[in-house]
């Protein structure tokens, strides 16, 4: 569908300050690397990822989403009370239910009348959310939407490192865990 009456008013991000390098992950995986005789530098070589940013421990996805949402509103001519639809479009969630959007909605200070929900579809979740919001604007259901994503990879990376260091895995056995790092 081609959208005629929809635009992106602002785009903003909120990045965590802490950097977790591939070198540090490999250092923490040294028992596994030594046991399987894996060469250092393999993680960065295979992924192209030198470093990733991680939120402090116990940071919830709604905290990251709220920070990004506040930053987007600050850069726009739209006030929080004009938002009629709020979507948290991430894989990470505060909990299964209620929607993570409900927590971020409160933290941003959006109106109680705003529709809220989560859209989780891996890397396409944000694009799906844009399409949903634009379709609702085009159809006249709403005038303004705020879409956020707040991922927190720290718990997954930490659990993966722990699993790889404690499980009795061979080179083939570690492959399913690779994308988690």
Identify the residue ranges that each predicted region occupies:
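Acyl-thioester C-C bond-transforming condensing/cleaving domain
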Residues: 2, 34, 74-80, 94-98, ...
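Short glycine-rich or small-residue beta-strand-to-loop segments that form or flank ligand, phosphate
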Residues: 84-91
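Conserved "HGTGT" condensation-loop signature of ketosynthase/thiolase-family condensing enzymes
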Residues: 1-84, 106-109, 178
